[in-house]
């Protein structure tokens, strides 16, 4: 007789409990997010048996958290997100420092993973707001894609991220990219349009910081993306997107990539001061 072990966090729905293992009957099997885990005498281990279209459980939806800090249009993007998600969306607002805002988002989340939408992201209506991490046994973050309306790039910059709650709270040492400083997986699904070009300062600082990160990464894919940031632009404030990227590369070169100098780019106040020092004749709100 087969015995079934059911995760207490899982609500089973319409699963055929008369199913019997037919690959290796001496083993037990655990279904989890479309793959099978072998639960034999040596303990559970991953077995990549193809089991398509198995509907066996329902997990409660993950918390969705929206993070903003006074961005132009934040109210509209929050309203859209809540409408598309079809449920309440938690809102972290006005917390200084991206890493502090991420920790606050993790703190208020009641689920072990949560999906974070940054304030600049205009949520895509086709995004799966009921997304679940494919392997909850491995603590990592899942980075979606966002579409850049200025230069057409599509990758994880300014995209939604499915964060592991405990991993966020336990992250104290990190590099230029808080999220990528810990185990992560890229999920090439568009989560929205990154509307970072809503005003001059937001456009410039977003491009500046991303250019610093891409320059620091230095791999072929990052450098190709940097080339696009430096050369392509359309729509509102597109010139300041290119200028911001150019200024970011110049700053990286001027400080010889020194880590402590690059980490200053985390702070909005520093970015505004740096902008004023290199563009004294331009107002942060001019066009």
Residue ranges and their predicted role:
Residues 3, 10-12, 22-24, 28-108:
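N-terminal anchoring/stem segment of glycosyltransferases
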Residues 5, 114:
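Short aromatic/hydrophobic "clamp" motif used to bind/position activated sugar donors
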Residues 9-13, 121-124:
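A short, conserved beta-strand element in the Rossmann-like catalytic core
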Residues 10-56, 131-287:
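Catalytic-site signature of metal-activated, phosphate-bearing donor transferases
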Residues 15-16, 76, 125-128:
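Short glycine-/acidic-enriched loop or helix-start segments at secondary-structure transitions
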Residues 79-81, 129-132:
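Short, glycine/charged-enriched secondary-structure capping and boundary segments
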Residues 117-130, 176:
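Extended, charge-rich low-complexity interaction segments
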């Amino acid at each position: 007789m087969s015995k079934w072990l059911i995760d207490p966090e899982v609500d089973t729905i319409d699963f055929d409990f008369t199913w019997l293992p037919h690959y290796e009957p001496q083993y037990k099997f655990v279904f989890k997010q479309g793959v099978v885990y072998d639960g034999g005498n040596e303990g559970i281990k991953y077995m990549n048996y193809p089991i398509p279209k198995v509907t066996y459980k329902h997990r409660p939806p993950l918390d969705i958290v929206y993070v903003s800090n006074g961005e132009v249009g934040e109210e509209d993007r929050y309203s859209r997100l809540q409408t598309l998600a079809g449920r309440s969306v938690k809102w972290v607002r006005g917390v200084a420092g991206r890493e502090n805002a991420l920790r606050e988002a993790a703190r208020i989340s009641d689920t072990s993973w949560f999906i974070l939408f940054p304030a600049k992201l205009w949520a895509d209506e086709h995004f799966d707001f009921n997304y679940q991490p494919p392997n909850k046994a491995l603590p990592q973050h899942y980075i979606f894609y966002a579409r850049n309306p200025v230069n057409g790039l599509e990758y994880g910059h300014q995209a939604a991220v499915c964060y592991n709650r405990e991993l966020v709270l336990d992250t104290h040492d990190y590099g230029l990219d808080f999220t990528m400083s810990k185990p992560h997986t890229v999920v090439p699904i568009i989560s929205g349009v990154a509307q970072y070009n809503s005003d001059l300062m937001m456009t410039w600082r977003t491009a500046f910081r991303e250019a610093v990160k891409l320059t620091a990464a230095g791999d072929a894919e990052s450098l190709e993306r940097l080339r696009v940031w430096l050369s392509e632009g359309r729509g509102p404030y597109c010139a300041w997107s290119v200028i911001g990227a150019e200024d970011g590369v110049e700053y990286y070169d001027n400080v010889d990539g020194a880590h402590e100098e690059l980490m200053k780019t985390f702070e909005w106040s520093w970015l505004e001061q740096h902008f004023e020092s290199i563009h004294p004749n331009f107002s942060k709100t001019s066009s």
